[in-house]
């Protein structure tokens, strides 16, 4: 840990991920809660902490598209659709892409698709690159509360035991835009 015990160094957060723990980290607009997408235990802990029903599905955030390919059905996309996606990545657009049948239900919820984003936040890029895979990502807030924008706000909502990657959120005021990769339909404005 660093001088301030409320802030974890990257190595501490990586260790927490390997131990199937939930972490908090800064993203483009707010702090996110994240965990290893391949750990059902970690995802269930995140859902319980967030007080979020599993049926809603989750978002994966990554350093690059290659990290997301094991979770989505890349063959469902046309070259034109891929071109559209890559034209705004890394960046603040989350795309909903069809999944493989073996993509875990704890990620997709009641859907046959998954929301994914390649982040342009330098700490998210570093975290996912060093971890070697994407992270589950959901805004750090309890149901009905405002999303956390500072480490202090994370501590108020979630307590002091949650590992929090030291850093600042990016300058964006709104969460990422969410679009359907096949139709272009907008689900959430960014």
Swiss-Prot record:
Q: What EC identifiers does the entry list?
A: 2.7.7.87
Family of this protein:
Belongs to the SUA5 family. TsaC subfamily.
What residues does the YrdC-like domain cover?
Answer: 7-190
Biological process (GO) annotations?
Answer: regulation of translational fidelity; tRNA threonylcarbamoyladenosine modification
Q: Which InterPro entries match?
A: DHBP_synth_RibB-like_a/b_dom, Sua5-like_dom, TC-AMP_synthase, TC-AMP_synthase_SUA5
Origin superkingdom: Bacteria
Using the UniProt record, name the top-level EC class of this enzyme in a single word.
Answer: transferase
Identify the PROSITE patterns for this entry: YRDC
Q: Does the keyword Lipid biosynthesis apply?
A: no
Any Gene Ontology CC annotation: cytoplasm
Q: Which HAMAP family match?
A: TsaC
GO function terms (MF aspect): ATP binding; double-stranded RNA binding; L-threonylcarbamoyladenylate synthase; tRNA binding
Question: Which keywords does this Swiss-Prot/TrEMBL entry list?
Answer: ATP-binding, Cytoplasm, Nucleotide-binding, Nucleotidyltransferase, Transferase, tRNA processing
Free-text function comment from the UniProt entry:
Required for the formation of a threonylcarbamoyl group on adenosine at position 37 (t(6)A37) in tRNAs that read codons beginning with adenine. Catalyzes the conversion of L-threonine, HCO(3)(-)/CO(2) and ATP to give threonylcarbamoyl-AMP (TC-AMP) as the acyladenylate intermediate, with the release of diphosphate.
Which reactions does this protein catalyse? L-threonine + hydrogencarbonate + ATP = L-threonylcarbamoyladenylate + diphosphate + H2O
The name under which this protein is listed is Threonylcarbamoyl-AMP synthase
Cellular compartment(s): Cytoplasm
């Amino acid at each position: 840990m660093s001088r301030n015990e409320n802030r974890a160094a990257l190595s501490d957060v990586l260790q927490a991920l390997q131990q199937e723990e939930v972490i908090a980290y800064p993203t483009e607009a707010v702090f996110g809660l994240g965990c290893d997408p391949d750990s059902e235990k970690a995802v269930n802990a995140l859902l319980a902490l967030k007080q979020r029903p599993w049926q809603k599905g989750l978002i994966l955030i990554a350093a690059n598209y290659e990290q997301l390919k094991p979770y989505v059905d890349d063959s469902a996309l046309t070259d034109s659709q891929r071109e559209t996606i890559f034209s705004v990545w890394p960046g603040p657009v989350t795309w909903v892409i069809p999944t493989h049948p073996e993509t875990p239900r704890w990620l997709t919820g009641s859907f046959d698709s998954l929301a994914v984003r390649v982040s342009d936040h330098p700490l998210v890029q570093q975290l996912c690159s060093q971890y070697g895979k994407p992270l589950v990502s959901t805004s750090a807030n309890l149901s009905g509360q405002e999303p956390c924008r500072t480490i202090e706000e994370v501590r108020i909502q979630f307590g002091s035991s949650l590992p929090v990657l030291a850093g600042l959120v990016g300058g964006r005021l709104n969460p990422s835009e969410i679009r359907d990769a096949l139709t272009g339909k907008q689900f959430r404005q960014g």
